Design a protein with these regions (language model features):
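Active-site loop and adjoining helix of the penicillin-binding protein/serine DD-peptidase-beta-lactamase fold
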Residues: 146
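Small-residue (G/A/S/T)-rich helix-start motifs and N-terminal tracts that mark the onset
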Residues: 1-130, 134-141, 149, 154-292
Length: 292
């Protein structure tokens, strides 16, 4: 089955639900500090798209990460701090990376390219989005990429595989599988149904209102995913299948993103920031086993 609009998972695929999402969320313990709860390094945003940095950081903070280090451009950094003063903008230890949101490969300067490359070569789990997708081959640690159809088409083209956005849309689960196999990464392919493939795991996520098709929605998803990956970072390196762990976490992020969209919408229009602000309730519903 290849209809991306169907409400059911294709044969052989897992359908994401609140219980699976709950298991991917790292709960704080009595002996935790901000470091043990996960530190997310963030290199997102640009002079052209500074808001993407704000949205991703906001979403990560509201999903429950212990600490965020934002290391993007100065203008975006000022906007991030104005919204979230608890964010740290000094370099230092991180346990996972979120890179690429709010960047455009065509306008990315050498400094940004070098900084993202250095992050990806640390061997840490990384969420690679948008304007950093062309750099995924430089990563030395486990990676989850978060393309939409057009971005996946460009990513595959860079690997010598021709597939138009229309072809990918016509068989989204099949192309998500092929991309994961060819690129050696976990793939979260965004759409009305989101398809996640990593290692031996295939998950379909059908959650959220069509109002989620709004500017900045993907930046919020990146922040949610970055937060969950940072929380899971201690168990990823020693896992028998690190990409399968990333797939479980990525599917949970997609479910939370969709549920937060439903909560924020209430049947009406929403903005990306509305979705980020609804994230604590979406997390709570997952932990309680409720929600869609």
């Amino acid at each position: 089955m290849s209809d991306a609009q169907d409400d059911h998972a294709p044969d052989g695929w897992i359908r994401q639900d609140a219980e699976r999402t709950r298991r991917a969320i790292r709960l704080p313990r009595d002996d935790d500090d901000k470091y043990t709860r996960g530190v997310l390094g963030v290199r997102t945003g640009s002079d052209r798209y500074p808001g993407a940095a704000v949205l991703g950081v906001e979403a990560a903070a509201r999903t429950g990460v212990g600490m965020i280090r934002y290391l993007g451009p100065a203008g975006a950094s000022a906007s991030v701090l104005a919204r979230r003063p608890e964010v740290v903008t000094a370099d230092g230890r991180v346990q996972a990376w979120l890179v690429g949101s709010g960047m455009d490969q065509a306008h990315r300067d050498d400094a940004a390219t070098d900084a993202i490359t250095a992050a990806l070569r640390q061997g840490l789990p990384a969420v690679v989005d948008a304007g950093a997708l062309d750099l995924v081959g430089r990563a030395t640690g486990p990676v989850v990429v978060t393309p939409h159809f057009r971005e996946l088409s460009r990513l595959l083209d860079g690997a010598g595989i021709e597939a138009s956005a229309e072809q990918i849309a016509a068989d989204a689960p099949g192309w998500a599988e092929r991309a994961a196999q060819e690129l050696g990464v976990c793939v979260l392919l965004k759409g009305a149904t989101t398809y996640v493939v990593g290692g031996g795991t295939r998950i379909a996520v059908r959650a959220g209102t069509p109002w989620l098709a709004t500017a900045g929605s993907g930046d919020v998803l990146g922040g949610v995913l970055g937060s969950l990956v940072a929380g899971a970072s201690a168990r990823i390196p020693d896992a028998a299948d690190p990409l399968a762990v990333l797939a479980d976490v990525a599917a949970a992020a997609a479910w939370l993103h969709g549920r937060a969209g439903d909560i924020a919408s209430g049947g009406g229009p929403i903005t990306a920031l509305d979705v980020a602000e609804a994230m604590p309730r979406a997390v709570r519903e997952a932990l309680e086993g409720s929600g869609a």
